[in-house]
Amino acid sequence: MAKEVFQRTKPHMNVGTIGHVDHGKTTLTAAISIYCSKVNKDAKALKYEDIDNAPEEKARGITINARHIEYETAGRHYAHVDCPGHADYIKNMITGAAQMDAAILLVAADSGAEPQTKEHLLLAQRMGIKKIIVFLNKLDLADPELVELVEVEVLELVEKYGFPGDTPIVKGSAFGAMSNPDDPEATKCIKELLETMDSYFDLPERDIDKPFLLAIEDVFSISGRGTVATGRIERGIIKVGQEVEIVGIRETRKTTVTGVEMFQKILEQGEAGDNVGLLLRGVDKKDVERGQVIAAIGTITPHKKFKASIYCLTKEEGGRHKPFFSGYRPQFFFRTTDVTGMVSLEGKEMVMPGDNVDIVVELISLIAMDKNVEFAVREGGRTVASGRILEILE
């Protein structure tokens, strides 16, 4: 069957659901998908099981890797990432957040904000997300007086992490909407959420004029066609027949893009902001991996050593309890990759939680990087600092 061509009739935006495990992120994603399929006859409804689609996820009922679905509202085309809330999988949440323009923060009305709610807000802020909408879920299970307290608490938290004080809150039950898609009362919260997304989220300015760059999120082998790398186009435009370079982790190599697709539809060209799959000529699946980037030839180089300015989270923000010294070896998260690096302090003996400081980092492998790129620093399963590259040293 020939694939259909993706029609660009509405502005495209990437959103995602973030929040604590079991607060209902995947249920909300499914409820949106089902609601949009009722309103728009072309849309495909995805059930909870379709979104949580890895065997381990079905067994545990939690999302491990970020999942993508698409839907349309009256005014926009959305790509929606369902981000994992489970602590072990927060690094996949970082990959998901790196692809979002805006986020929907889920908070269960019956339990309020929890540790991961804070960590996700911090990561969203570090990944450059400017606006969020709060979806207060499980309203049917919560004491009405408690709901008001949760609202106040959540808005305080949202402001603390640098999001606007007038962040909208939509209240409802994602499970109710998913289970009763034909009941207007049950789906009212989904309708309100989508309308709020259209009106409150600003369409991002896309770097279409800059050289092409995509950070690889996943790699697949399609029999008879070759190797496909997926990810979000960070900047520029890509067309079939274009020569590109695969940079980072391994030796830089050239290849040609022989196909561009989004959500199983053919794209005439991929643009900044699109989540795409690129078919690569003559590249074996084992030669490409998550964390590399695909870029216009000669526009980005791999490096190991750089100077950066970082902010170390306090104990209250979920960071370290003790200072660190030269020789500290945490993981550095760039775009879709995490790599161990060694920290050197210059003119400073130690770094305390809560400090803003400049450091020199030497990574154990070469990563495609440029100035001003932001990164997260993690250790032992938690985010301990966030930073930005000031200068590339080697």
From Swiss-Prot:
Residue sites binding Mg(2+) per the record: 26
Region (G2): 61-65
CDD domains cross-referenced by the UniProt entry: EF_Tu, EFTU_II, EFTU_III
Stored InterPro entries: EF-Tu_GTP-bd, EF-Tu_GTPase, EFTu-like_2, EFTU_2, G_TR_CS, P-loop_NTPase, Small_GTP-bd, T_Tr_GTP-bd_dom
Annotated segments matching region G1: 19-26
GO molecular function, one term: GTP binding
EC code(s) of this entry: 3.6.5.3
Name recorded for this polypeptide: Elongation factor Tu
